[in-house]
Amino acid sequence: MFHRHLCKLCSKTPSAATLASPLGKLQEERGEGVAKDPKKDKQHRQIFLQKFRERLDSDTTGKNTLAGFIDLPEGISPTMAAVGPLKRGEEPLPPWLKMKVAKGVSRLPRFNRIRNSMREKRLATVCEEAKCPNIGECWGGDEEEGTATATIMVMGSHCTRGCRFCSVLTSRTPPPLDPDEPQKVANAVAEMGVDYIVMTMVDRDDLTDGGAAHVVRCVNTIKEKNPLLLLEALVGDFHGDLKLVETVALSPLSVYAHNIECVERITPNVRDRRASYRQSLKVLEHVNSFTKGAMLTKSSIMLGLGEKEEEVRQTLRDLRTAGVSAVTLGQYLQPARTRLKVSRYAHPKEFQMWEEEAMAMGFLYCASGPLVRSSYRAGEYYIKSLVKQRGAAATKSNTTTTTTTTTTTTTTNTASLAAATVTDSATLQGE
């Protein structure tokens, strides 16, 4: 009971320190150091607000309004609200990159089939992980023509490299490979009902072969279950080991894709130090020379990282010299605050210019646009026809080679037999 009374006394009596200070004396005079009557306090507030309103209403100079207290830029009103204020130095997103998601996409049978299959088997897709704006277009596809495409990422979700443009998680010691992954991917692809699939990978520098053997197992398992499927593999550089590149190129792929990413000058600032511009070119060139042009090769360039026009042009020339047949160009968009900032937003007309120049250089296929990504509409009609033409040409070449070899062998054997007969006849006559 005594404690309760003491608490009440303390709450009403100002402290010695408060009374000793000039501010404390002022508070005491105003009655701020002691408990107040809530009703009186409310009345004081109402009176103050009423007087303040009257003051604003009676003012004719405009100095007592909100605009009179702050300096605003021209064209901005004091009541204008900005949603998501830009940070200093950031450029606003241009209108051509503000893409609305098509209504009803999630109700498309093929879109749902792909999404459900991926989630049930707990497989990662670049489409969802990167929040690709083209997901509805690629997953929905054309139900009759079968142009739907999905990009599956294998070998886990942790990459051993730390490229400054990529939002994929980085780890020096990622989890071990899933031995059942090839079969899971093959089953998922079969359930999707697509006729073109893109399979990409994280870099695994912790593995001796960089994951090349695992990639080959995935490709073989997918093709065994889906023989007519066209398969594009977007793979890494495998430490620059060309023997490992050959191992992957020998698998039943339709398209061998490896991204150059950006122009040579800015590569050290954009990509991981273990990835280089010249190494990527060497990989692509070796695939073409090793397969004697039978394998369709593909690469991709990002704009908006600080490149110059002539540098982009030179990169296209380098890719074409390396034998690359298909190329894509798209706008780099910062995936997270910790990643590289966008240096500029290229206009759609610029992308159109690069597409025209690429085709003039001799590329068989070029997709160029602000929202284009490396696997954008990979399964569209034209690139599928290119793959089939290459496959038919390779089969014809092998058949011709086999026929020629057989004919040569038969001719040689016949000539040898004829020579032996003549020799035997001469021997008999001599006897």
Swiss-Prot record:
- According to the entry, every stretch annotated as the Radical SAM core domain falls at 142-364
User: What family, per the record?
Assistant: Belongs to the radical SAM superfamily. Lipoyl synthase family.
- Composition bias type Basic and acidic residues, residue spans: 26-40
Q: Where on this chain does [4Fe-4S] cluster 2 bind?
A: 159, 163, 166
Miscellaneous comment text of the record: This protein may be expected to contain an N-terminal transit peptide but none has been predicted.
Write one Gene Ontology MF term: metal ion binding
Q: What class of enzyme is it?
A: transferase
InterPro entries cross-referenced by the UniProt entry: Aldolase_TIM (IPR013785), Elp3/MiaA/NifB-like_rSAM (IPR006638), LIAS_N (IPR031691), Lipoyl_synth (IPR003698), rSAM (IPR007197)
UniProt source species? Trypanosoma cruzi (strain CL Brener)
Q: Which UniProt keywords apply?
A: 4Fe-4S, Iron, Iron-sulfur, Metal-binding, Mitochondrion, S-adenosyl-L-methionine, Transferase
E.C. number, please?
2.8.1.8
Task: Please list the cofactors this protein needs.
Answer: [4Fe-4S] cluster
Tree of life domain: Eukaryota
Gene Ontology CC entries for this record: mitochondrion
Co-factor note (free text)? Binds 2 [4Fe-4S] clusters per subunit. One cluster is coordinated with 3 cysteines and an exchangeable S-adenosyl-L-methionine.
Residues annotated as binding [4Fe-4S] cluster 1: 127, 132, 138, 375
Tell me what this protein is called: Lipoyl synthase 2, mitochondrial
The compartments listed are: Mitochondrion
**Reactions accelerated catalytically:** [[Fe-S] cluster scaffold protein carrying a second [4Fe-4S](2+) cluster] + N(6)-octanoyl-L-lysyl-[protein] + 2 oxidized [2Fe-2S]-[ferredoxin] + 2 S-adenosyl-L-methionine + 4 H(+) = [[Fe-S] cluster scaffold protein] + N(6)-[(R)-dihydrolipoyl]-L-lysyl-[protein] + 4 Fe(3+) + 2 hydrogen sulfide + 2 5'-deoxyadenosine + 2 L-methionine + 2 reduced [2Fe-2S]-[ferredoxin]
